[in-house]
Amino acid sequence: MAPLAWMVLSSFKSSADVTAYPPTLVFPPTLGNYAHLFGTTPFLAYARNSLIVTAGSTVLGLLLGVPAAYAVSLTRVTWPALLTLAARMAPGTLFLLPWYVMFREAGLIGSYWALVLTHAVITMPVVIWVLLPSFDAIPRSVLEAAQVDGCGVLRSLWRIALPLVGPGLVVASILAFVFSWNYFLFALVLSNADTKTLIAAAFNFVGEGSTDWGALMAAATLIALPPLLLAAAVQRWLVSGLTLGAVKG
């Protein structure tokens, strides 16, 4: 909590107070950093871009990740999940150049599609690994009974499995949202002035000779608000989803 508190307090400090040493806990608060943030940047446009990219990549990541997690749980074949985890653990710079070339050849550099697709690839492994314990916790007898009654794989996923893994689905959605919302590298390289997201726009306050720490902390505070508010709103499902499948037997 200390870094978050320091970030929020610094957003209300003047430039002199932010860089003062030793740090001051008592200072005259100012809204100048927020006024500078909204006065010099199209902050609301960047927020709209972030919402479009994050919502699109979260939905796409769920559409791809939920059936994949269900298939891995149903078949007990673990290598696809291990492969996606290995891809997720690889540094983003490993994929940056080939993805940039691919999207440039497709004419998608600077478009929402480039950001949505790359962020969906980033969030899908998270969705798979969060939902695997939830699907594994469903009794096999329930799924077998659904198959006996004529439910196919997709229908049993939609009608039987998904209602039983609601908390896990909430956790997967939140984590996918947070990962996409906060991802910096591809948002910086694949966007342009019209599609730049908040996390990439905040980098504008970092200069070669100096950094506008007050405006940067104000931007960081506002960027951190949506994930925090979302997690607080669904805290009950978040806790149960994280613990689901942790204890068996």
PLM region descriptions:
Residues 1-249:
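A hydrophobic, multi-pass inner-membrane permease signature
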